[in-house]
Amino acid sequence: MTLLKKVPGPIAVLMLVIVLSATATWLIPAGEYNKLAMADDASHFKVSTATGSVALPLTQQTLDSLNILIPLEKFTTQAIRKPVSVPGSYHALPKYGQGVFSILQAPIKGIYDTIDIILFILIIGGFMQVFHESGALVRGIEHLSWRMRGRETWLIVILTFLFSFAGSSYGMAEEALVFYPVLVPLFLAAGYDLLVPLAVIFGGTQLGTLSSFSNPFSTIIASNAAGVSWQEGLDGRVLMFVLSTAISVWYIVRYAQKVKKDPTASIVYQVDGAVSPPYDVATDPAAPKGPLDWRTRGLLLVFACTFLGMIGGVIFLGWWLLEMSTLFLGASLLLAVLLRLPEKAFVEQFIQGAEGLLSVAFIVGIARGVTVVLNDGRISDSILYYSAQWVGNMPPALFVVMLLCLFMLFTLFIASSSGMAVLTMPIIGALAMVVHVPGESIVNAYLFGMGIMGFMTPTGLMLPSLALVNVSIAAWWRFIRPLLLMLFALCSAFLIWSVVF
């Protein structure tokens, strides 16, 4: 317990990971695969090599000759946009060891690379502060808590399912950050601790990563890169969605009920002590529980429409961070008009809200710095190459389980699901053919490994999520460890079954 309490904060952990990654660039041989991509004018393929780039005909024969098992139309329709690794093309490079100056530059470069996410988070903070000042959020939460008394468990069941479904279907990830200021007060008012909303929101979306059945950023891109249809293995992934979500809901509900019965049983209380999230969540249990007034209903309607608009825009209109940020900025201005806020008061509240999430924004940027160091040191492909050589001659059942473990390892270095797919799938896909493992099994191993490791990797959304509820890494790891062991056993059994039967 004493050791757990000594775990440093999120930013210190990330800087330590950056230092370790820089050290690895001196120990692991540098190297890379040739990368194939369609030219900007869509007239030919462009292959990047150690000595430059080569133009090749934009034909299926070109892909076949390079042993890239991807139909040509996946490139011409831009289903695959990022450069794809060419199997068998790995070559050594001179060492690109990253020194002290590179370590100091890494978080700055990471912030540059993630400025769209950072601005999204800051604008969310401003929006939530303006809305919170209206008092409608507190009154709405008090009203909902009163209406749900005795049925709080259903909040966990329904919301975990919804977040898991959103992650599995269209890849909800960064968008879920907006729900913490809304749901944390609701779960605290129900008598739970800070781990419960964290497990529901972050855990739910991460379950969606693990069991993605139609996520365009992982399942579809990975299937395309592996040369199989994303619909192959769809029934199995839907089954995994049901099983993994059911196990997680049972685990969260069991913990929540224990904490509600005895607050001292809270892992947050035992590890972190009495902590509170970085924003005001105070509600009044003794407040009148009559119907909401029309002003509050109107403000809550604007609030709900903003979130529904975001979800609808992502699913149906292809929105991403620019459009979502614009939506929340516009909603903030609309609230200012409805609340008749003076210009100075609005700006002060908006800036105050953004300041409250500034540490979260920095964590996102610094986390990207890990990838910057590995890429600048030219060892990301080397890790993939030596890992592929290691598992290449294993029997199918052992091969898929080792792939699961390897993808867990890769998640530490490659936080982007689509980036990992186009870098690894052509290489792993070629290996899978040699050991007679079907393509959908390697896609599932990729999803399972990335999903499980995403619960605890410091380079993903774990640390920003922890910062939003002010829970330590030690408390989260202690809470999530038993669940991850169950999910790992489930995923391993499913993969073995898929190649044996």
Residue ranges of each PLM-predicted region?
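Membrane-core helix-loop-helix motifs of multi-pass transport proteins
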Residues: 2-13, 180-271, 290-297, 460-494
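Hydrophobic alpha-helical transmembrane segments of multi-pass integral membrane proteins
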Residues: 122, 151-182, 364-374, 390-430
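Long, contiguous bundles of hydrophobic transmembrane helices that form the permeation core
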Residues: 2-11, 32-47, 235-349, 469, ...
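Alpha-helical transmembrane segments of multi-pass membrane proteins
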Residues: 121, 152-167, 192-207, 233, ...
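Core transmembrane alpha-helical segments of multi-pass membrane transporters/permeases
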Residues: 10-19, 47-138, 319-382
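Hydrophobic core segments of alpha-helical transmembrane domains in multi-pass membrane transport
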Residues: 13-27, 121-129, 162-166, 208, ...
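Membrane-interfacial loop-to-helix junctions in multi-pass transporters
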Residues: 112-118, 146-158, 190-196, 354-362, ...
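C-terminal transmembrane helix pair
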Residues: 8, 391-501
